[in-house]
Amino acid sequence: MTQQDKEVLINLLNQYKDLGISEQIDFQKFYIYSIIAHSTAIEGSTVTEVEAQLLFDEGITSSKRTMQEQMMNLDLKAAYEYGMKWIQQHEPITVDWLISLAAKVMNHTGSEYNTMDGSFSAARGELRKLNVSAGLGGPSYMSYQKVPSRLAAFCDELNKRRSSADKTDLYAIYYLSFWAHYELVTIHPWADGNGRTARLLMNLLQMEYDLLPVRVLKEDKIAYIQALVDTRNNEDISIFIDSMMQLHIEHLRNDIDKFLKTTEEGDSDGTKETAQNNVAENVAEKLTDRQRIIVELVTQGAAQNVAVNTKYLSEKLNVNRKTIQRDMAHLQERRLIQWVGSDKTGHWEIIKEVK
């Protein structure tokens, strides 16, 4: 992930905070409900967010969904509630604790297994005693005999990273959580529930330091799984890390855009305008000299009825178009400019004046 991408992530998180999106009534509850519904959907559940909300808050089940699907959601909700309280104690993460976490994830849907090496229960979070593969004909995960020692080593490394992490470095904490997700799902300690438990652990590590948890939507499933596969095949953790960072950036953008659209009408007290002004003031300090000049040129263009596009700015500043495009992306992330019109004949306009 480039330094620019890191800045984009931080700026979007700041904008999210400045707009007060997470301060809305019951935001955290519904945000977690969304995470749960999509996490189970990735594993085959067809329960929608609305159905999950009715199930969680009112105990209303859907006749369109199987009991198995609905129990998947109720179990994962219980696991999140347990984990969110526990993680704030900042205790070491151990193999026994991961087993207890997995037991909550699979409480009512886990199966009993009988193997040559003994029986075990997914509902109790017990480690697998059989070998598993990634789908029919897919690559096999590590031998089950290696799982206990590998899981213990993972816990030791995770706790070291947690204790040495810079709590003020948001990117570093997200990195840690994505690393933990990948490592746990790669070890694949259980016969079932590995994906849900890995995503849960990822979110808990983020919440431990008050970061906005990352959602993996059902629409992200193909890209998400492909990132896991590519990382494994190339033995390059940066592939998964970058993919998850970009996923979070995309969802932050979408949430911000949706929030702004829903507050465009009926805002008589000026709250939205005040929030946007605060955002503009905060980000203006982080602009480069060239970016400030670009803002001035776009402003002048509007006053002189000149269509300012990438080619125009490239010629004016005597820099290549790729450089201009990076600057424009930077300004767009800060919601200072926007593109108006078609790709070929459109132009840039100012959203907020930089003071």
How does the language model describe each region?
Residues 1-192, 196-355:
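FIC/Doc superfamily catalytic core
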